[in-house]
Amino acid sequence: MKNKKALFIPLFIIILFIAFFNKIINFIINIKWFKEVNYLTIYFTKMRAIIILMIPIFIIFFISIWMYYKSLMINKNKSIVDIGLNKNDYGKKLFFIFNFIASIFLAYIFSSSYWYRILQFNNSVDFNVKDPIFFKDVSFYVFKLPLFESLYKVIISLLLFLVITTFIAYFILEAKYKIQSKKDINLKNINHGIKSFAGKQLAIVSGLIILFISFGHLIKIWNLVYSSNGVSFGASYTDVHATLLFYKIIVVITLISSIVTLLSIVKGKFKPVSICIGITIFLIVSQNIASFLVQNFIVKSNEKTLEQPYIKNNIDLTRKAFALDDIEIRDFDIKNDLQKQDITDNKASIDNIRINSFKPTLEFYNQVQIIRYYYTFNDIDIDRYNINGKYNQVFLAAREIDTDALNPNTWQNRHLIYTHGFGAVMNKVNSVTSEGQPDFVIKDIPPYNKTNIKLTNPRIYFGEKTNDYVIVNTKINEFDYPKEDSNKTNKYNGHAGIKMSFINRLLFSINKKDINFLLSKDIKKDSKIIINRNIVERAKKIAPFLTYDSDPYMVIYNGKIYWIIDAYTTTNRYPYSEPYDSINYIRNSAKVVIDSVDGDINFYITDKKDPIVNNYDKIFKGLFKEEKDAPKEIREHFRYPKDLFSIQSKVLGKYHVKDPGVFYNGEDLWEVSKDQKHVEGETNTNDAPYIIMKLPDQNKEEMVLLNYFNVMKKDNMIALFGARMDGEQYGKKILYKLPSDKTVYSPYLFKQKINQDTNISKELSLWNREGSQVQYGDTIILPIKNSLLYIEPLYLRASGKNSIPEMKRVILSYNDKLVLSPSIQEGIKEIFNSKDNKINDKNEKDSTKTIDDSKLKKAQEYYNKAIEAQKNGDWTKYGENINELGNILNSIK
């Protein structure tokens, strides 16, 4: 017997080890990885919190369950107990083991579920904003109330669990007693039996349940700030004058009832317990009836007047929660009286007008610049750079490896050879080639660079498409980039990765379920495995409590590619704030910067005023750095994020209104303007563009994120909403309100104006014939002084599977003028009837030259061949013909 007991503990440990084997392996690998990226303390924050919490929680659970068990065992009804668990010490030992395991399990579940809320509670940071009903700081609702709710649910659940298990225990023991004593089971005596077995215990539990019902209604009182019963979000007239009153009464009555219940137990009287429970149920039902009567017989007929103060609460706090309370609002009186000097003063804005559009440019990148089939451009980013002394807006993209496209897709190819992407592509947004294609300033492999931007190490080990692990410094050279008939190879010289010792090879073989880690002869002791290479997943692994932007963007700095991810702090617990997309508070409080070669990742706080990020900073010490610690050249590329701007625009459509009466009437609702991508296509919401522009009353150009607003369900534009992002202006928002008594063309109305112009529509119809299709680019509406300039690039796509759109014309509109032009500059000249002497002089000189007709015919021939090659996707032939065409054109200059 002793030998069996001696074997029990090691056997139990072995069973636990087998059951949690995979978790143990993951745990060891996580420790190694977090140590590699220098965030091991962040990983241990959670573990340390869980362990510290588990100890007192375990003691509370263990003692409570044991005391409850003992109280049942000293019952007067010995008939059950003697035959039950109290017959010998074996029952006590069995219950002790059960209680020990159950208490550990419950303590772990509780601690792992609520450690974060407890740490948030302990590290609460004030918002310095009070709710208008209970005058509590918002931090109470965001950091403290969630923990109270969790504790309430857990304790109520445990108390109900005790009641249920008590009944189950009674029935089991009663049945066992009846069977062993060969007596019939009499259901009529159940009530008496339960009272004898656990009457006092159940009465105590009932008293505690009533006590926590009181606490639950106190929580309901605080939760009225999230009520959706009124015309606006938050506590309404009915909530404050009826529901709140009843909740307060219920809190007091249930508190008294719990005391009465406990005193009744001492005196051995159970009738008061039933009365207290009945009163509680009556009050809860009465509250619902009273609220219904107040809403329908008092509020409904006087709603606008009675609800106004509560609507104002909703407006004020929603605007604060979505950072709309600091918008600079200006009237924009459209006069359309620009002079030639105004055009000259805004030349930099006009020169940076974007005529390249996202989708066709990405298509072109993936046709012309992937170089090999296994490369891909995941998306295109837009940013601003000082190129050769000029402030330019550019498109740029990183050339990543698409490992799923590898052929053959072997283990060595996927994990040892094709380890990284190579290079970047950049073009200015304001210019195209003579064929209407992006005009590259950085392109090809190795990079051909016409800029002053240094790119000396363009390798991409960490990116948006790097979803698999790689092993570097093996006996096999890594593929670097293709060069003519051979390939350039590379040895990784970064510091990312975990050394592949035999133990680590074994760990990863188990973790990845791949024997190749052990069998491969190419892996050396100095080899390193690089995991978690996807930049967003890498950030989430370290800081899962942040919300990340859907569009990370690349920056070229210090000769390398870096990634920037906008990180948000969000909550749905901000009082009175209307929820949008399941949140009712958001701040872009951090920027995440990741090195594409070394994988170094840094979290920079960019909004020190945000209490949530300050709460995180107190909990996860060492995670965040100050914004000033980021390199200046990186900070210059911080953008106002489009995801944040999108949700702010959605909220602003309703909450630009500050007057409760107007808000109640719903008479001034806005929506983001619609747009049309094809001549005869469907409409969709306009995508907010990043624009280089000089804001009215400003002295220099800057990058601004701009959205256009219409009146709800109308196409008349009513406002321009912009977010600034250059230097000290970062984060400042401005709203230009347009005249409501004039028709101001929205992007969609602008398209209708184009379609109704007889000359332009005729030209579009000719292009949009069988074999080709006209596509609209990204609509830009540029404010210049007190006027609006409309720009619409036109793309022509030839038929054919691999054809790509080419930018052929630009439509410009100003006031009542509408022109179709080969370029922005020519369109501006046509609209404003201005003349450029240099251009005219050059044209005059060129017109005196005699051009050989045979050269023109040859040029036409090469052009036709190039177009045919493009349709067929034969980019080699296409390039050859374009080069020949270029030679002819150069010869006739």
UniProtKB/Swiss-Prot annotation:
<feature type="transmembrane region" description="Helical">
    <location>
        <begin position="154"/>
        <end position="174"/>
    </location>
</feature>
<dbReference type="InterPro" id="IPR005372">
    <property type="entry name" value="UPF0182"/>
</dbReference>
<feature type="transmembrane region" description="Helical">
    <location>
        <begin position="49"/>
        <end position="69"/>
    </location>
</feature>
<feature type="transmembrane region" description="Helical">
    <location>
        <begin position="246"/>
        <end position="266"/>
    </location>
</feature>
<feature type="transmembrane region" description="Helical">
    <location>
        <begin position="273"/>
        <end position="293"/>
    </location>
</feature>
<keyword id="KW-0472">Membrane</keyword>
<protein>
    <recommendedName>
        <fullName>UPF0182 protein CLJ_B0017</fullName>
    </recommendedName>
</protein>
<feature type="transmembrane region" description="Helical">
    <location>
        <begin position="202"/>
        <end position="222"/>
    </location>
</feature>
<dbReference type="GO" id="GO:0005886">
    <property type="term" value="C:plasma membrane"/>
</dbReference>
<keyword id="KW-0812">Transmembrane</keyword>
<dbReference type="Pfam" id="PF03699">
    <property type="entry name" value="UPF0182"/>
</dbReference>
<feature type="transmembrane region" description="Helical">
    <location>
        <begin position="9"/>
        <end position="29"/>
    </location>
</feature>
<dbReference type="GO" id="GO:0005576">
    <property type="term" value="C:extracellular region"/>
</dbReference>
<keyword id="KW-1133">Transmembrane helix</keyword>
<feature type="transmembrane region" description="Helical">
    <location>
        <begin position="94"/>
        <end position="114"/>
    </location>
</feature>
<keyword id="KW-1003">Cell membrane</keyword>
<comment type="similarity">
    <text>Belongs to the UPF0182 family.</text>
</comment>
